[in-house]
Amino acid sequence: MQRTIKSFFQPKLGAEVKTKEEKVKNDVQKEKEEPEKSVPERPLKERNGRALCGDTESPVKRVSKKSARVLESDSEEEEENSKVQATPEKMNNESDPKNDVKETPPSARKETPPSARKETPPSARKETPQSARKETPPSARKDAKSEGASEMNTSQDFVSPCSSKSIDSPLCSDSPGISPSGIPKRKTARKQLPKRKLEISPSESNPPKDDFDVKGAVKRQKKEAEGDIQQEEPMETSHNISMEEECPIKKETNPDVVQETISNADDPNIELVDQKDVVSGEKQSEPKCQEQPQPKLTSPTVEPKASKGKARKKNSPLPKKVKFSDKVSFKDNDSEEKSNEEKSDEEPQKKADSAKPVKQISSFFAPRKPAIKTEKREENLNEKNVTETSLEESPKPKKNVGSFFGASKQEATEEQTEYNPSKSKYHPIDDACWCNGQKVPYLAVARTFERIEEESARLKNVETLSNFLRSVIALTPEDLLPCIYLCLNRLGPAYEGLELGIGETILMKAVAQATGRQLEKIKAEAQEKGDLGLVAESSRSNQRTMFTPPKLMASGVFGKLKDIARMTGNASMNKKIDIIKGLFVACRHSEARYIARSLGGKLRIGLAEQSVLSSIAQAVCLTPPGRDAPPTVMDAGKGMSADARKSWIEEKAMILKQTFCELPNYDAIIPILLEHGIDDLPKHCRLTPGIPLKPMLAHPTKGIGEVLKRFDEAAFTCEYKYDGERAQIHILENGEVHVYSRNQENNTTKYPDIISRIPKIKKESVKSCILDTEAVAGDAEKKQIQPFQVLTTRKRKDVDASEIKVQVCVYAFDMLYLNGESLVKEPFAKRRQLLRDSFLETEGQFMFATYMDKSNTDEISEFLDQSIKDSCEGLMVKTLEQDATYEIAKRSHNWLKLKKDYLEGVGDTLDLVVIGAYLGKGKRTGIYGGFLLASYDEESEEYQTICKIGTGFTDDDLEKHYNFLKDHVIENPRSYYRWDSATEPDHWFDPVQVWEVKCADLSISPVHKAALGLVEDQKGISLRFPRFLRIRDDKKPEESTNSFQVADLYRKQQQIQNTSSTEKAEEDFY
């Protein structure tokens, strides 16, 4: 039994006593032969854990593991015995099997005399507490060298954490003693002392050793008796040692990690390489040990301490492999040479080693990396590099752990946060914050909006947006269309009628629910900042969440906005709020600001549609799309001069703008642009009936003299400017008829009466066409035009022809398309003639605009007066031949308008009192952006609201008004104010100031209360298009325009005079 235990702790000892030289030779041979034999005999199942100690093939029985534990515990107890007679039981709990194997060479163990081993009785060892070993000072370690016997006894007791009772057997103290080769053993054990302390867990240190360790010892003894020593010799390889080091941890860690480590250990390739390294290391280290013994000792001593705990974190056996191979080779040389100089060299190194381990304790809890990955990294390093690498790599496991909880996401987030499309020399791929094929993050869109909002220069904003779009084209071309719609704050073509329909109150409620704030605070902050978007951003940034929601993507946000717009029904509002809440919760940084603004209907970043078109053109020019992903050309304008580059881009932008004018549908243009490029757009995108155009608009003039000066000698014509609603009538080849407004809204269901007339008034030659007309309210029997206010009383959607009360007459004045041919490039004279040749005029239903082709000033003046008498707004003056094309979506100087409110002597100004104001938004944030005006009623002695006003002010005017009126704010309106809840202002004022205001005309209003009941029962009068002129400091509020004056001004309007006679006749026959 004694012999079996000795051999168990000394795997290289044979059954017979041999000489020193023979033992060394046998050890070398075993190291070379055993790996091949042992690999196939070690099934993965047996090597997984120590519970299989009973099997003869179990890795727990392997001498490598046993010897490693014996040697490491041996060195630990050396320190303990030098300070106190250590208790082997507690020492066993803290010992590391790995370190023992590395530090004890076979030769050293064989030379140790049994007497030396028996010097320290087991009882003395049992009395040593755990703390004694941890507190062992460097001096104690030095003295411990002389106590080789006691140290060897304790080391042998630590066969493994599985066999603690073997400590009590005196026969187990046959481990190497005071021989020269024993010194390095003790030194190496001290080096790795901190590591052993870290690896021992409380669960292993006490109760389990009494039961489980004894069984392991007995089983190993049986194995020794059966002659399994040779199979255990490969334990000297670094790989086997790493396996032993993992033993005490395997019980505490995840089984998956344990299995991964064991599977790596079973790899025969890895084991063979390790053994070769060990043998070669022994041969090469021999001359080095003779010439430079101290450096050879230094590297192994420093390394274990530097990597203490760190190698364990990584779960990597390689650092230990390098250490072990070096140490074993060095010890073998020691045993042959018996050098006393090396003993003295080890002492100062032990001192240095003892001071290092404390720093590494804190890293015990860091997770471990896979073993093989680290092994490959460090396999080619020398000893010193291994030491440095182990120190440098210690924080890396922490990095991996952090990334497990989202560190890598955080890095990506930081990259997106720093995205700057306005930087100079922007690269579409390198400077983008997403990768090829990935969805465009909405944060990139928000960052682009931020840069545009901060910059006032239009050209710079065009460049910024084009840079962003270049990245989209290069990396994610399928997201180009959603990104463009987000920049325009639209959900699709205007004629599709997709509107969000989210009011400010609903938005505030959604923000409050999403951020957990009180609705009252949201409202108060919104009034203070003047921008609900900023409130949403600040509210979201102050909110903390337990789990980070998925990041918003541009296409995803666009899809959610479309879903909101399509929802209808009684429960739709709650569903919309839920979607909005989901968007706000996932917002980062400025995303909430622009989502709130998008939902509110205005981005307020100063980005007009023409700027967006210019940006698209510039992006496509510089980074032309293609089938390659990403495109091969990143900057097509590289090498051009600044002027050439500018003119080239402007030329391409004009192609896009003209194409968009004829086909204002991004859904149709963008796919063709990506597939065929910008040069081929006109071939594929043409004017198409069913897709509304943006109409041509006219410039206002101050008088007839300006008209004559503008057109000079060019022929022009004058037409009535009808006071109605612009109507673009599309007749399709299949016979369908659509009516669109000037804003491209589909009004087909609003005018079923017009639809029914078209087949009757068009000639058979007309297969398809597009007409530009004005829908005007009129009385066909009286042949009179009614004011625009009458037209507004019609139902806006889904009108039933049988329920129509306000009849409409269509006044056609232009034709843009006829039978498959676009006429926009034709002169106006030709278009007008084609119009008259293609349709039949019907009184009160379909009429051609009244015109006069004369250029005499007097005749024009008379014609203007006649237009006003005929209840029109004034005249439209147009060129006939020269520069007479139809300029889609342009306010052209080739069309001029003469309106009555622009001429002197027509209309009158009103003096009105300011009684309320609305807080400004956007550029007017911090001051008042609009005001509520009222007239004074002398009979009732009250102020009656007449209009809201927000135009005609300069920035100085607004500042002046704010500074004056803020001192006259009252909490509630005066009892003598007559107003409607629909016009309630943010601040009420005392009536202290009178303003002079001009307007286009006056109209009947159900909301405003001026002249209430004087013109129409239960209705008042309001101003259309009021403009601020000046402050009337010479008038008191009571001297302002009164209700009777307002009613009189309304009656004096020419078109009202025309309708008043009709109304009297109707009243007469009523």
Swiss-Prot record:
It is an enzyme of class 6 (ligase). DNA ligase that seals nicks in double-stranded during DNA repair. Also involved in DNA replication and DNA recombination. Residues 184-195 have a biased composition (Basic residues). Belongs to the ATP-dependent DNA ligase family. GO terms for cellular component: mitochondrion; nucleus. Residues 1-403 are annotated as: Disordered. Residues 151-167, 291-301 have a biased composition (Polar residues). It is found in: Nucleus. Its EC number is 6.5.1.1. This is DNA ligase 1. Residues 602-611, 795-797 are annotated as: Interaction with target DNA. Mg(2+) 2 binds at E873. The keyword Magnesium applies.
